[in-house]
Amino acid sequence: MSTVEPLSDEGVAAGPRRIEVPRPPSIEEFTIVKPISRGAFGKVYLGRKAGRLYAVKVMKKADMINKNMVHQVQAERDALALSKSPFIVHLYYSLQSANNVYLVMEYLIGGDVKSLLHIYGYFDEEMAVKYISEAALALDYLHRHGIIHRDLKPDNMLISNQGHIKLTDFGLSRVTLNREINMIDILTTPSMAKPKHDYSRTPGQLLSLISSLGFYTPVGMKMPINPNSGGASDSLHEVISPLSMIEKENTPLSTKLFKTGLDTSPLTPVMPVRSLTPALLQSRERFGASTASSQSCMYLSSMESECCSSPRLEKDVKQTEDEMCSTGTSNSRPPLPSSREVLNSKDPKVLKKELESAISPISSNDCGSRQKLGTERSEITDTPVTTLDTKGIVRKCLSENKIWEEKLVARREMTNEMLETASSQQSPLFLKDPVQPVKEEEIFEKPGVKRSFELVDTSPCQELNYVKKTNAEYKRGCWISELSASKSTGLTTEIQSLMLSGEICESKEIMRCIDRQQTEKPLVPTVAKNLLCDLDADHEKDKEYMNSSLLCADDEKPLGALSADSDLSFPETSVSESHLEKQLVDLDKGVKDLSFEEPKAEDLLTMSPNCQEASRNGVEADVVQNCTMLCCEQDNHQKHTEETDTISSPSEKMTETVHLFRKNNVVFRSYNSPINVSNVSDPCSMASLDIMDLSPACSGSYPTAITPLQKTPRQGDAGTPYRTPKSVRRGAAPVEGERILGTPDYLAPELLLTKPHGSAVDWWALGVCLFEFLTGIPPFNDETPAQVFQNILKRDIPWPEGEEKLSDNAQNAIDILLTFDSTKRAGLKELKHHPLFHGVDWDNLQNQPMPFIPQPDDETDTSYFEARNNAQHLTVSGFSL
């Protein structure tokens, strides 16, 4: 037996009643009729919605961000939303899209007072007094509610249909409400006494006025004020999803990518801001916790590290890597070979083509259809990013594989000849400790940071990376040998014998030195294509190399303390290279800074021009003193080394000067930065801190590889920072150094003098407007803004004379408004008692007849704005937003 649902009076089955939730309208609901005017920060259009006309002010978010005016847009919206006065333009809606902010206000058909002034030439005294009186009431209302206009001028005074004045354009205003406005602020804003007009707002208007303006919303994301536009959501989803252009049927995967990759707050800065936290956490996870991992681990390049710093792009990289891993697993492919094997075994062109196809999301060699690609993409898992071998190889091969391959062969032959010549030198130290041959692959195994041609594959940062990635046992953690140069009294600083002690790593330094001196190095640091370019991930193959490493991860800590406070640091880098640089000072690795023509006894020790200039400027004395500290510390461990006087020997002095300059060449690295590492156990840390204000330009003949950013300037001896430290202290905030905002002719002197200012700046501007109404020209007008500012500071007012002379009351009213001392400047109270405003009915101004009442041809007539536009050569015929 069936049951019949009870019906309502209309004959419809009774059920739960749906209550429509109020929501703000969309900007699509407004129809643009014509443009009205254009200002410094936006354009004003005449719009229509439901048969009613509005003035729509359009401001581009990108322009507001570029001009650093984001907070001013918020202030303008708040000031208009809080105001309920017959002398202030009424704001109905505050809307926004992905690119623009829209302020929907009432349309005043009479135009602005500036246009009327251009037509009249100047106003008579009665007309000027009425306009100034209504503007004074508007200013008093704003000041009582904590709002300072700061841009009062005839251009921002609009004429209503009845001829009354209404202030507009609060783009430079200041709202003392130190929080976002809420519903209570708008509902309980007091209005004028017994107004005839109702200033109530609809729920949709209230919601739009208290909504947050998202200036950093991701591109294409749906704005919070328009939650019910389903069609727009679908279209935006298609634009953003990377898979929508490939396979639109794959809805679950597209939805997953959309939610995970772009699930951010509307106010989250995604594109213009770089987040450093993910990169630092990944750095700790990879290199900081353990060194026992023997897995192949590739480093990100500088461009890739930036991508991973962004939450959105990081997830894209993650899914791409997971896709590659899943594809390789499903096809049972063998693991990728190491980067050295790939680079040495294949032709560069073939290698480039294969690697491009391997890293590309859409492989050109894949004979499958789009459906197959979608199936593979559906296998994406949520495993973290493990390796970037293929991506790192592609980045390297695309940038320098051709040049590196061509020059590598020639450099190998040249180095072999130089090595034989250097090995033939018979010194006591060589006889005592013969040099062991070095494998070519240990020297040419990685191109390294591309500082210059000679330094392509000899980056000192490689040794630090090996330390972090190996658990090999170190044998040289106790004492280190020292370069002992022969004494010489010649002025040419000759090196009579080059004595080196050593192991494989020391002969490796000889070869590096020989390679580096074949070409004159530029003084300007070259740009590094990749700050993190260690392409070789085959750790097991280099066990012997790592066993002979000069660095001990347990005993020799990096100079972590310098990474935060050192003014020698370059942008986008870390102090990890200084870990290796310390060893270069203590050891005989300083020979890499010497210039060699031929490896003979009569070679000359030369310094780079930068270092020579530093010596002439008196830097050498401090360096020598610090050299003594280093040598004394090393002599305690070396009994077989003869004592040398560093002060009396020019050769030794310059050698150690080069050492210290080499050490202080601190280069930051963006991804492998040791974060919480102490430098207490460093034997040379104190001496290095004493000379940290040496210029990084004095780096010997070893040019520094830095990013294409500005180098940090030389820090003075006083230690004064070039930028004020960020304020994290408690207590009262310091006085903010504000910019000078406004139109030059109407600026108060305290604004020009960058003094703290208040509501008195508006009364000064009102005095300027009164003078302009009576004369047709602002009192401080001149040819250039600089001359206008001088006239304001001198209070140079050209009073009319003869028949054009102003009345005494008018001149006195202007004087009290243009008082230089802001504390003695007149306000509404003084104007009410002034003789010029004697017959003004202040309590009933909005009902008084006005001298000018606009007579438009129709409701869409904008001709009253044309006079000002023509005077300022503004063309508003276009509809471009």
Curated annotation (Swiss-Prot):
Its main location: cytoplasm. Residues 30-837 form the Protein kinase domain. Keywords: ATP-binding, Cell cycle, Cell division, Cytoplasm, Cytoskeleton, Kinase, Mitosis, Nucleotide-binding, Nucleus, Phosphoprotein, Serine/threonine-protein kinase, Transferase. GO terms for molecular function: ATP binding; protein phosphatase 2A binding; protein serine kinase activity; protein serine/threonine kinase activity. Its EC number is 2.7.11.1. ATP binds at I36, S37, R38, G39, A40, F41, G42, K43, V44, K57. Phosphorylation at Thr-743 by CDK1 during M phase activates its kinase activity. Maximum phosphorylation occurs in prometaphase. GO terms for cellular component: centrosome; cleavage furrow; cytoplasm; nucleus. It is an enzyme of class 2 (transferase). Pfam families: Pkinase (PF00069). Residues 312-321 have a biased composition (Basic and acidic residues). The keyword Zinc does not apply. It catalyses: L-seryl-[protein] + ATP = O-phospho-L-seryl-[protein] + ADP + H(+); L-threonyl-[protein] + ATP = O-phospho-L-threonyl-[protein] + ADP + H(+). Residues 838-881 form the AGC-kinase C-terminal domain. Belongs to the protein kinase superfamily. AGC Ser/Thr protein kinase family. PANTHER family: SERINE/THREONINE-PROTEIN KINASE, SERINE_THREONINE-PROTEIN KINASE GREATWALL. This is Serine/threonine-protein kinase greatwall. It comes from Gallus gallus.
